[in-house]
Amino acid sequence: MTNSVYFQLDSVESLIDELPYMYYLGLFFVNVLILYYAFLMEYIVLNVGIVFLPEDMDQALVDLGVLSDPASIPYDTDTELDVFEGYLE
């Protein structure tokens, strides 16, 4: 019983040994390229992308028309408290 298991393991090991060295060299270069592009994307996001962000996000949203002028309307906090009145009692 154990001899047949050893023969099967030997046959699997012989298949692994028959892979050419260029296969492993190709895997190495694929891994290097993946790491290169990962660090390149990280550099672009962290360093180059920050340049295009405006300093004042509220003003940028006002310029786009998404947000009304934040300085023109006073912020009312009482409306937020009214929502939770039923839960607090």
From Swiss-Prot:
Which species does the entry assign this protein to?
Answer: Danio rerio (Zebrafish)
Q: Name one Pfam family in it.
A: Dexa_ind
Q: What is this protein called?
A: Dexamethasone-induced protein homolog
Instruction: Family membership, please give it.
Output: Belongs to the DEXI family.
Q: Note the superkingdom of the native organism.
A: Eukaryota
Which InterPro entries would you find in this protein's record? Dexamethasone-induced (IPR023259)
Q: Which PANTHER family does the UniProt entry name for this protein?
A: DEXAMETHASONE-INDUCED PROTEIN (PTHR17070:SF0)
The primary gene name is dexi
